[in-house]
């Protein structure tokens, strides 16, 4: 650029914008723009203008035709290399590095299953344990598969690959490129992850041609000729019945998980690798082998028994597909049954640059209009503890309803959504009816176990004697039979199609039972296989999983969305059905409630948990003749002919009752399984599983206020994804909470086995229940309810908050007698509550203070002198606490005229 040009170029910044007509879109109104903004325009025009060169615009003028209605489709996606499919189990071994707070990767294991079933193990070691030397997913697959080509074990590059690991999120983060390329392609499911978009284009040629030290390769890059595969991740944990561990999977396969010999341990695999490389490799490779062999066994099972050619992501998904298939096979329209309709719409697909047809299911108007009722009536199971402490010694039985929810599904016939009607007549909710209502209720005081649930956001379900409840028809019918006064505020009845009688065993009703074909298929297939086999367990899990899918998404439960990095509401499943979910849970709660209320008057119930209860009544003495129990037994006869509706799962001689879901065995009953529910407490890792019960009993008996436990847990999916962390253990301290949860009102304190023992009664109403629960949460911060002195202190604390606090009397850490001392001094100074001027003269302020100090109260002469300044509150005393009675026993001999207003002495 010449000096002339430079000066011309600089000169333009001093000129007004109107001097540059060649700059389109600039007028005098924009003259105030910052000079730097000139650079946003065509700089070539500016430079040409500055140099005195005329520049012509050769670009064609664009018209509307230049912008087509539909953009052109993008280039055709790269095809996969071949039709060959390979299944690969993989695993990693690592040790935690406290300096980096990440894992040092020791090895990557693979176990490739060829099309003929031959297994090829392989193990790869990174150059070092440093994070920079980790293998990428592409490198791992390339180094695993290339030797197979060279050895002619495969003759072409696989077009599709499925990677299997047990608890997938423990291993996928070990790849160097996982967080940059793949983390949004995995979906969070039940604390782990699985593929939900399964195509990754991998240029394996490029990977093989690069050195190990330079493995930073764009995942979607293509070369020519390409080696491109579809890769899918499957977590085998999600396809195990009950979330079995890898060792249990190995046992089912006859392929046991190897053990680590002493002196080595799982906590220091580096030591094992250095000391016994061959043993380390055998142990590591077996885990990868079990994962893929188990998955292929499941795949074979799905193909032969379920007609599904792929390995499902979860067992719950199988349950859904089988249910819909059985409905269609039985001649019932799944849409009519579920109250849905198929809606077709056109959606733009940016990948193909074209429209695609999408079909979705939506509720029909009749269902959508009324489904708020069942959603509000969906509460889950009944969970309560009726005792606190160590029970008397006798036989205690833990009963469960046989297949509670699966059996309960049989109670559902085909609903007639178009004829739903409102009803405020309680009698309409009796019998075999699907109904949902908001009710007001009052049970007689004699009812031990009220059956209408009241939901709280913080503390779960309560069952008080009076209140308001969103209840199902079976619960309303039971409440009426117990003598409750019921007022239906708003309610609906959902009629059955082809309903003819109240007898569920009626053949016409069985034909209409929505879930009968599904339940029969599950039962028949379970019976076809040996008990405890993989197939039998799989069918059992398929049957049990369906209920959860019916209720999925009804309440505001959230799950971490790995694609967005946010906690998102758990979406409904394809069979979410509030009418079915609410009816089944209400029916099961009602059956359990009927059984407990039918027990002999002197029977003791320790607790109830969802579908069963702990009691001292033997099976032959339980009355199962009630209408709801009879109906449930009839359903059991359909599901499993000849079976009993109640099964005894545990039997012990003595129990420790702590709180809801917290019952332990104090003394065993020989030959029977023990009761062991830990209320969410996880024993330390060094405690053997066989010693868990004894550990928990000792922990409960020796607990102290503020007791804290160290808890080791794995980092959550949320924290792992947001922080791009390895799967590492997280240590935390939690406050022990084994105190009673006050879902019931404690009564009759006694001591047994050195610990406080109490029974309970239902709350009169929810206001008392919630207030006392909140106050107890305050009290237990510095106290534990272990003996009669603790009970006395709690009752005193409760009295202070209920009587003194509303009168704005300062309580703080004081107790009822401390406050009464202050009130006594005010009455003495002001000649109130039966005290006279002569009483005031009887002792000096110093003498009164000394007298009370000797009795254990913190009082000074100034307190006595100043007592006349504060007014006495307009208090009316009811019954007194033990502390107040002791104080009155101290005062009355000295001041016999002293009397509390309306006190009961």
Label for each model-derived stretch:
Residues 173, 236, 242-243, 383-556:
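Catalytic nucleotidyl-transfer cores of nucleotide-processing enzymes
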Residues 92-100, 401-407:
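Short acidic, Gly/Ser-rich segments with clustered Asp/Glu that frequently serve as metal-coordination loops
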């Amino acid at each position: 650029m010449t000096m002339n040009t430079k000066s011309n170029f600089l000169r333009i910044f001093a000129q007004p914008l109107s001097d540059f007509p060649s700059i389109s879109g600039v007028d005098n109104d924009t003259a105030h723009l910052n000079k730097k903004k000139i650079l946003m325009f065509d700089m070539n025009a500016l430079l040409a203008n500055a140099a005195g060169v005329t520049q012509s615009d050769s670009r064609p003028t664009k018209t509307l035709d230049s912008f087509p209605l539909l953009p052109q489709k993008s280039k055709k996606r790269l095809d996969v290399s071949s039709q060959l499919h390979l299944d690969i189990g993989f695993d990693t071994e690592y040790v935690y590095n406290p300096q980096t707070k990440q894992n040092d990767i020791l090895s990557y294991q693979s176990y490739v299953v060829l099309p003929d079933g031959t297994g090829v193990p392989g193990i790869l070691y990174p150059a070092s344990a440093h994070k920079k030397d980790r293998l990428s997913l592409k490198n791992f697959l390339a180094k695993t598969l290339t030797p197979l080509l060279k050895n002619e074990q495969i003759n072409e590059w696989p077009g599709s690959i499925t990677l299997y690991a047990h608890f997938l999120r423990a291993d996928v983060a070990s790849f160097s490129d996982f967080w940059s390329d793949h983390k949004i392609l995995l979906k969070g499911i039940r604390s782990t992850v699985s593929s939900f978009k399964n195509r990754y284009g991998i240029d394996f040629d490029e990977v093989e041609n690069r050195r190990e030290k330079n493995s930073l390769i764009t995942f979607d890059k293509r070369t020519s000729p390409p080696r491109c595969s579809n890769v899918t991740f499957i977590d085998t944990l999600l396809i195990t019945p009950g979330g079995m561990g890898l060792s249990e999977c190995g046992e089912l396969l006859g392929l046991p998980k190897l053990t680590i010999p002493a002196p080595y341990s799982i906590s220091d695999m580096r030591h094992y690798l250095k000391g016994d490389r061959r043993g380390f490799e055998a142990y590591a490779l077996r885990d990868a082998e079990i994962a893929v062999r188990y998955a292929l066994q499941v795949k074979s099972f799905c193909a032969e028994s379920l007609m599904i050619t792929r390995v499902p992501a979860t067992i719950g998904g199988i349950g859904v597909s089988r249910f819909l298939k059985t409905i269609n096979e039985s001649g019932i329209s799944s849409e009519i049954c579920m109250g849905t309709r198929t809606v077709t719409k056109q959606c733009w697909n940016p990948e193909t640059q074209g429209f695609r047809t999408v079909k979705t299911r939506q509720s029909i108007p009749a269902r959508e209009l009324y489904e708020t009722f069942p959603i509000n009536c969906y509460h889950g199971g009944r969970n309560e503890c009726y005792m606190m402490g160590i029970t008397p010694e006798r036989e205690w039985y833990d009963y469960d309803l046989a297949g509670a929810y699966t059996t309960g599904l049989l109670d559902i016939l085909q609903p007639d959504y178009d004829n739903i009607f409102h009803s405020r007549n309680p009698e309409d909710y009796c019998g075999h009816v699907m109904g949902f209502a908001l009710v007001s209720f009052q049970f007689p005081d004699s009812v031990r176990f009220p059956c209408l649930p009241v939901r709280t956001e913080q503390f779960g379900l309560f069952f008080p004697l009076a209140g308001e409840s969103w209840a199902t028809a079976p619960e309303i019918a039971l409440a009426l039979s117990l003598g409750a006064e019921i007022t239906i505020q708003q309610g609906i009845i959902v009629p059955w199609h082809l309903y003819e009688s109240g007898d569920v065993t009626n053949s016409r009703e069985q034909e209409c039972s929505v879930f009968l074909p599904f339940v029969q298929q599950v039962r028949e297939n379970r019976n076809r296989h040996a008990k405890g086999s993989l197939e039998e367990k799989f069918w059992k899990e398929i049957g049990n999983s369906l209920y959860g899918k019916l209720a999925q998404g009804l309440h505001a439960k959230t799950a971490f969305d790995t694609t967005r990095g946010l906690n998102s509401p758990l979406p409904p499943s394809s069979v979410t059905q509030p009418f079915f979910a609410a009816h089944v849970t209400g029916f099961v709660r009602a059956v359990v409630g009927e059984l407990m209320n039918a027990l002999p008057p002197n029977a003791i119930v320790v607790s109830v948990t969802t579908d069963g209860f702990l009691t001292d009544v033997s099976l032959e003495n339980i009355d199962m003749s009630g209408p709801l129990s009879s109906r449930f037994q009839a359903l059991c006869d359909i599901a499993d002919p000849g079976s009993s509706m109640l099964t005894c799962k545990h039997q012990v001689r003595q129990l420790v009752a702590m709180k809801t879901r917290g019952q332990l065995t104090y003394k065993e009953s020989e030959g029977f399984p023990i009761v062991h529910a830990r209320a969410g407490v996880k024993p330390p890792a060094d405690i053997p599983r066989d010693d868990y019960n004894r550990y928990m009993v000792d922990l409960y008996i020796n607990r102290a206020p503020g007791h804290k436990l160290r808890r080791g847990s794995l980092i959550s999916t949320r924290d792992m994804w947001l922080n791009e962390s390895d799967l590492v253990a997280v240590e935390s301290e939690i406050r022990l909470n084994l105190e009673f949860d006050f879902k019931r009102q404690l009564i009759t304190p006694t001591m047994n086995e050195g610990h406080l023992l109490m029974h309970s009664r239902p709350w009169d109403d929810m206001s008392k229940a919630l207030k006392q629960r909140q106050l107890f949460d305050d009290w237990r911060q510095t106290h534990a309810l272990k003996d009669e002195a603790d009970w006395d202190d709690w009752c005193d604390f409760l009295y202070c908050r209920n009587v003194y606090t509303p009168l704005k009397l300062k309580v703080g850490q004081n107790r009822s007698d401390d406050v009464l001392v202050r009130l006594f001094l005010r009455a003495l100074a002001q000649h109130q509550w039966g005290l006279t001027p002569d009483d005031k003269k009887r002792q000096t302020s110093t003498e009164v203070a000394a007298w009370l100090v000797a009795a254990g109260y913190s009082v000074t002469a100034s307190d006595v002198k100043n007592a006349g300044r504060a007014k006495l509150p307009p208090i009316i005393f009811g019954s007194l606490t033990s502390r107040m009675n002791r104080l009155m026993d101290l005062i009355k001999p000295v001041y016999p005229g002293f009397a509390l207003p309306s006190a009961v002495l």
